[in-house]
Amino acid sequence: MKYDLNFFLGLEIQVWEALKNGDKNANYNLLSDDFLGVYETGLSSKEDHLELLRNGPIISCYEIGASQLIQLSPEITSLTYSATATFLKNEEQKTQVLLYITSIWARRLNKWVNIFSQDTKGNTHY
């Protein structure tokens, strides 16, 4: 069975919307309990990721660019894409960033959850 790119983009958009809306519950439901994030600041657990939303939204807007889906097994997929996002509450208050992201989604108990995400900062002319 081949999986649909748009389905997994839809899941990823739910993660972005949770960051934009400060929705810890949505993020909680989308990330696996053993989630691992790899970011420029280091490794991040599910709890670390949820803590980012403690004071509300962390981005004001985002846009997903070119994307590619690789089916790793019947129950695991890898989604890689580019995104631009305007982050809030950092040293400069608002910073637009270009990212290249790989998220691995696994179906567990008939539900797709994000088990791994790695963000790589790209060069941009903003």
Task: Describe each model-derived feature in a short phrase.
Residues 2-29, 34-126:
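A beta-strand edge to alpha-helix "cap/lid" segment located at domain peripheries
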